[in-house]
Amino acid sequence: MDRRDAMALSGSGSYYIQRGIPGSGPPPPQTQPTFHGSQGFHHFTNSISPFGSNPNPNPNPGGVSTGFVSPPLPVDSSPADSSAAAAGALVAPPSGDTSVKRKRGRPRKYGQDGGSVSLALSPSISNVSPNSNKRGRGRPPGSGKKQRLSSIGEMMPSSTGMSFTPHVIVVSIGEDIASKVISFSHQGPRAICVLSASGAVSTATLLQPAPSHGTIIYEGLFELISLSTSYLNTTDNDYPNRTGSLAVSLASPDGRVIGGGIGGPLIAASQVQVIVGSFIWAIPKGKIKKREETSEDVQDTDALENNNDNTAATSPPVPQQSQNIVQTPVGIWSTGSRSMDMHHPHMDIDLMRG
């Protein structure tokens, strides 16, 4: 019994290649050869039937071409090949579009590539600020008590200009503008200065230049351009004793401008508004003396510290009593070791001892 006949069982399927018959019609589309399995599980013997040939080698004059007709070739396959082919025909390859199911449970500590996943926590953006500058300790500069300004002459040794307050002085028709401003300046120890004024003047008494030292009276209707003055106290708690003067600039109806220091009454021809500012310009002497004393004490302590530093830097070093070393040239014996014996009378050195 042949080996192939023994392996070919009645239950094994046979496969054959289906070929088209040439000349039987239009050529079919080119397709790859497919394997078809018989549904009836029939077995074909390994017999080779002779191929038939067309006796007329010339083509058909009617236009129908004939060719070789071959019967289907039996294909003997081993059980392993048949099982593999059956598995390939029944099982379809998985498509690439199928989504991978996510496994349940805690994710793996290590990734697919075998590398370890970093477990370090990254700082949150809200907690980390790009410009996180530490605030200095103590009170920020400029938030403490108001400091004194530099001295402005002998009349104002400690001017600060604190507590500036604006005021409005209303002068009725026929009243003296200059006397109103002066009386307002005597109401308290505060210094005043005129910021602006508006209205009309009927009579103005102005001072002449220095050589004559006289006054000139102007009568008519004059427009008030500007009014400037400042009244300051010369001494503390002495209200009437003030320094300052008034100056005015007027415009006549014909376009002329006159002005100068006020040496007499300045009568208002209409309602005049004068804007005045008052401020505290001086500090009591007691506070000044205390601050000066404290500043002098600080300067004295600084000077003492500087002197101590200078003396410490210039004073020669004090030799230590425990050591008495005398530098001598090489090859010369010195008697400096005797002083060591004098400092230590109880020391006994025996050179014979080993």
Curated annotation (Swiss-Prot):
GO cellular component: nucleus
Short motif Bipartite nuclear localization signal, span: 101-109
UniProt biased composition (Acidic residues): 294-303
Entry's localization field: Nucleus
InterPro entries per the UniProt record, alphabetical: AHL (IPR039605), AT_hook_DNA-bd_motif (IPR017956), PPC_dom (IPR005175)
Domain of life: Eukaryota
Pfam families reported in the protein's UniProt record: PCC
Domain (PPC) ranges: 159-302
Polar residues bias: start-end ranges: 304-327
Biased composition (Basic and acidic residues): 340-354
Keywords on record: DNA-binding, Nucleus, Repeat, Transcription, Transcription regulation
Region (Disordered): 1-158, 290-354
Keyword DNA-binding recorded: yes
Molecular functions (GO terms): minor groove of adenine-thymine-rich DNA binding
Residue ranges, compositional bias (Low complexity): 46-55, 75-96, 122-133
DNA-binding region: 101-113, 134-146
PANTHER family registered for this protein in UniProt: AT-HOOK MOTIF NUCLEAR-LOCALIZED PROTEIN 11, AT-HOOK MOTIF NUCLEAR-LOCALIZED PROTEIN 9
Protein purpose: Transcription factor that specifically binds AT-rich DNA sequences related to the nuclear matrix attachment regions (MARs).
Entry text on domains: The PPC domain mediates interactions between AHL proteins.
Protein known as: AT-hook motif nuclear-localized protein 11
